[in-house]
Amino acid sequence: MPKQKAPRKQLKSYKLKHINKSIQEGDAVLMRSSEPGKPSYVARVEAIETDARGSHAKVRVRWYYRPEESIGGRRQFHGAKEVFLSDHFDFQSADTIEGKCKVHSFSSYTKLDSVGNDDFFCRFEYNSTTGAFDPDRVTVFCKCEMPYNPDDLMVQCEECSEWFHPSCIGTTIEEAKKPDNFYCEECSPQQQNLHNSNSTSNNRDAKVNGKRSLEVTKSKNKHTKRPG
């Protein structure tokens, strides 16, 4: 009669001796890439288990994908530290964990005073099979009608509260950083003098309340499935 395998123990936390840190369910971690020279994978710990003696720890992880691993690849509005929470789960040896990291919400990330090497942000969930995103649309800004990339400086119009990239309004980053009040072309005093107050008000309401958005999912031209 074949020997039955001993049941594995489910743990809420586990001490990783090789990095001298403890992990628990819900932690974001950096995991060793299977491809030399590639950056560490980012994952969320969903479960931890060991054998009956408390050895050979494994973690069930939910992978975060980088934009370049998705259908459509990296796009202009994707931040350098942006990741997508995928529907791809795996069991991995706990020994492949290289450290802990922090995956912030998009709102929290934009409020950070400084961004460390272990800081990331997530604003989309990603279906690794279909390439669909949730949400599938995102608000756009500026003349270029692009979603906000937290790596790129933007300036806000004092009148209509719209945001603009310096390059899109014909100025430099240095000029945009000056404390002077900024007015976009439509809200500038010169432009307002060409319209009566009623038409100016209508234009402003249309700009602020238009809720312009961009569809995130792109036509299929690239798809990288995380190995494992």
UniProtKB/Swiss-Prot annotation:
Null mutant phenotype: In antisense plants, dwarf phenotype characterized by stunted axis, dark-green leaves, compact rosette structure, less small leaves, fewer flowers and seeds, and associated with a delayed development and late flowering. In shl-2, acceleration of flowering, especially in short-days (SD), associated with a shorter adult vegetative phase. Other developmental defects include premature senescence, smaller leaves and siliques. Higher H3K9K14 acetylation in the genomic region of the SOC1 locus.
Keyword Transcription regulation found: yes
Compositional bias ranges of the Polar residues kind: 191-203
MF (Gene Ontology): chromatin binding; DNA-binding transcription factor activity; histone H3K4me3 reader activity; methylated histone binding; transcription cis-regulatory region binding; zinc ion binding
Span of the annotated motif Nuclear localization signal: 210-217
Chain intervals with Basic residues compositional bias: 219-228
GO biological process: flower development; negative regulation of gene expression, epigenetic; post-embryonic development; regulation of photoperiodism, flowering; vegetative to reproductive phase transition of meristem
Entry comment describing in which tissues the protein is expressed: Expressed ubiquitously. Mostly expressed in roots, stems, leaves and flowers, and, to a lower extent, in siliques.
Subcellular location, record wording: Nucleus
InterPro entries, per database record: BAH_dom, BAH_sf, Zinc_finger_PHD-type_CS, Znf_FYVE_PHD, Znf_PHD, Znf_PHD-finger, Znf_RING/FYVE/PHD
ZnF endpoints (PHD-type): 139-190
Region (Disordered) residue spans: 191-228
Residue ranges constituting the BAH domain according to the UniProt record: 21-137
GO CC annotations on file: nucleus
Alphabetical UniProt keywords: Chromatin regulator, Flowering, Metal-binding, Nucleus, Transcription, Transcription regulation, Zinc, Zinc-finger
Compositionally biased intervals (Basic and acidic residues): 204-218
Main function: Chromatin remodeling factor that binds to methylated histone (e.g. H3K4me2/3) to prevent their acetylation (e.g. H3K9K14Ac), likely by recruiting histone deacetylase (HDAC) complexes, and thus regulate the transcription of target genes. Required during development and for fertility, probably by modulating developmental gene expression. Promotes development speed, but at fitness cost. Involved in the chromatin-mediated repression of floral initiation and controls genes regulating flowering.
Family from the record: Belongs to the SHL1/EBS protein family.
Complex formation: Recognizes di- and trimethylated histone H3 at lysine 4. Interacts with HDA6. Interacts with DEK3.
Entry protein name: Chromatin remodeling protein SHL
